[in-house]
Amino acid sequence: MALLSGIFSSDMAIDLGTANTLVYVKGRGIIMNEPSVVAYHVKDGKKQVLAVGEDAKLMLGRTPGSIEAIRPMREGVIADFDTAEEMIKHFIRKVHKRTTFTKPKIIVCVPHGATPVEKRAIRQSVLSAGARRAGLIAEPIAAAIGAGMPITDPTGSMVVDIGGGTTEVAVLSLGDIVYARSIRVGGDRMDDAIVNYLRRQQNILIGDSTAERVKTSIGSARMPDDGRGASMLIRGRDLINGVPKETEVNQAQVAEALAEPVQAICEAVMTALETTPPDLAADIVDRGVMLTGGGALLGDLDLALREQTGLSISVADESLNCVALGTGKALEYERQLRHAIDYES
């Protein structure tokens, strides 16, 4: 029966991220990557789903009073249960074709630091959205698998997964987590830091989407060698007279804005090294540290970490997709990786 269920359903793995949700279908790979956003039309106190994913993200910060755009995930876990369920249900229906006969089995990655209540909320959302069975896998393990790290070897490996809401620092050996710490610093905190910096330094208020564009275009974890670096024009609202304003921001300013979240990530890595058993720490010195997640793409972050730790730092080839790929591999090779998947209710 289990074999027939696998044949006639689209079993899937989901990276339920704060910023984006990625869906991996067994035997097909990653087939969907959309923003974790739901837009509602609100009338007489009743909500009706208007858009989910990319279309809903376009509405963030631009909605009239009757439309509400919500990000149901915050810092890697569900902040709005009902909205998360609507979003997951939409993505499952989009991927799970009506030609299949049974509900899909779904594995979802969760932050290592998620509480039992938060894990239960994710599992219940997935089951309510139409899964026949819901498994959970720790995000650091999924990230390491997706990055191709030899986590089942009897040696230490360190992975630093920088997502939208959290950064997970973990030391792995023999297929399990030896040490892990989750800090509430990620891409969203970096965007907030840019918004706050420009508000203080240039009296301009920009939206989250503009801050994200600045981060991805000229964001840097280190001061540029020439003291200025690349620059770009941005538009926002002048906080002095309230009118629209265009101004230039350069790489040095962005590096200054990001100094605090970057330092928090560096300190989390240093704490992990100090806490790791000596033999495993020696392995990490030999093999270096792997960066995954969208935050790993921040300019010169690997160099900043190398300067602070003295270790070799590598960025995974598909850092944005590592967690989804790793969760997908856990689905594909479930028998070999069953120790990493939690199906407990």
Where are these regions (language model features)?
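Nucleotide/phosphate-binding catalytic cleft detector across ATP-hydrolyzing
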Residues: 1-162, 170-290, 296-345
